[in-house]
Amino acid sequence: MKTPTRLLISLSALALVLASCEEAQLESNDAELPQVVAAPETPASTKYASQNRPDVRGRIGAVSAGHPLAAQAGLRVLQSGGNATDAVIAMAGVLAVVRPHMNGIGGDAFGIFYDGETGEVAALNASGRAGALATPEFFAAAGLDQIPGAGPLSVSVPGAVAGWVDAHERYGSMDFADLLETGIDYARNGFAVSTRLAQDFEEQGANLNQAGLDLYLPNAAAPPVGSLLRNPALADSLQIVATEGKEGFYQGDIAKRLSAFITEQGGYLRPEDFANHTSNWVTPLRGDYLDHEFIVMPPNTQGVTQLALFAMAKSHDLKQQGQNTADYLHTLIELKKLAFADRDRWVADPEMAPVPVPQLLDSDYLRQRALAVDMAVAAVEVAPGFGEVAAAAPNGSRSDAGDTVYITAVDQWGNAVSWIQSNFAGFGSGLLDEATGILLHNRGALFTLETGHPNQVAPGKRPYHTLSPMMALYPNGQFAFTLGTPGGDSQTQTIIQITQNLLMFDMTPQQALEAPRFRSQTGNRLAIENRITEAVLRELRSRGHELNVIEGWTATFGGAQMIHRDPATGVLTAAADPRREAYAIAY
């Protein structure tokens, strides 16, 4: 994928296709969202041709990112002759600054890469591990039977920075330091606070420490909309990463300062835990569905769950049922429960625990599993298909959190990247280190303390991860599309709904993202957008689903992004979900 600079196109020659971002309520407050009136009675076969945003098409390159400033940074890289990996790194650096509660250099990342010249697909696991002190006995001595969802004990080693550097070393073409310049500039000199960002800060900032409150909620309120938000300490840290790479973060002053800060707060990370961290190039998982080959991350992520969901869907005639009919929605919801029961029982770090991926993806097994769906009644509890039920407790301090950013780019040489990075929950652990400006994630909260569970905490172990970027190829092996979304547990659910909108119901990428969605939660709890017809909602209730009908367009249902390539013309169509602040640009 490394490609020398071949093309320089002036920004003045480009008319950016930008659309306003819809404001949305936060998914962390699902239970507090009011019930609203559903859509009027309309034919169940309605195709959602109307859309909030235009289709964004280009013939040379495209980007889609979780914030317009990030998308613009990625576009500039592509137009300056950089490739898709260069663009993703630049966008990641900007998002670490302008969406600080959702991601940053204190969090984790994963990426899938397509080489336009060779057709090679590679996957990078840039998630961090528990420290050497993180034994079950350590937590038992603290009187805990569950790892806290925030605070110092929820912090595992941040992996994002190593991921940026490793991705650049393998595929990047521009100078690494140059790629972080825009993010550093926004951190040092400020960026304008949006309405959505101010709302996020106020609704998610309750667990912030004093340094975090001083920066993001001064005087107990978010910075005024339109004001400039600066984090000069973070700018300094990003500059160290830009000039010193991984060593500057994991072996230098940043690691020493962060480990000291975590120790002061009562956490378990020490300098050697940072120094020992590595990313890993891993073999992605592949599965066929709807005449495409889908590429996902292997465990420790829930990518295996995505492929299982696709495989089980083959046993039901979803197209005949009709998009967003009661039968269609009920089937997908019940299949999700089956897939998640296996996920919660088995998905963990395969370097430290047995994860039976071949059995979880066995076609005969999944065909039989899919037959367990009762079309008349929603299942309240679903057991895993194999393994002791007693060991199938949810992993760690699981919540419906989904405070993540997704990034994707396709360049003029046909290279494509699907990248995701996250703090896990809003503001992560709630711990902002004033000296470095780094907010630490809380991904370590997803370990369990249950004896014998594959995801039981252990030194040097990676926790189970919800992060699940995806890529699809045409049958001839050529790139088809990237797709990803924030949303925690809803990521796999959102991806199958969008995929079927695109491939089964012939929607454009933007239509596929904007169509009404559901989010199955614990038990029979179901968040669903009010653009679903009232007749369908009544039928779902009659089958036992406990509905929370939510007004669109809220962040409860993720914030998906996609870049699709037309196999006949090569035209790229980039899409960005209006439910959050995502932006798509193509040229």
Q: What label would you give each PLM region?
A:
Residues W281, A401-T404, H465-L467:
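Short, small/polar residue-rich loop motifs at catalytic or cofactor-binding pockets
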Residues E22-A24:
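Bacterial signal peptide processing site
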Residues M1-I9:
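Bacterial N-terminal signal peptides that target proteins for export
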Residues L26-Q72, R76, A84-G245, F249-Q251, ...:
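Noncatalytic scaffold domains of N-terminal-nucleophile
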Residues E41, S315-S422, T436, R443, ...:
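Internal maturation/activation junctions in enzymes
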Residues K461, I495, M504-A555:
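Extended C-terminal subregions enriched in glycine
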Residues V97-A123, Y268-R270, N415-F481, F505, ...:
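Active-site rim segments in enzyme catalytic domains, especially the processed small/beta chain
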Residues V17-S20:
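C-terminal motif of bacterial Sec signal peptides marking the signal peptidase cleavage site
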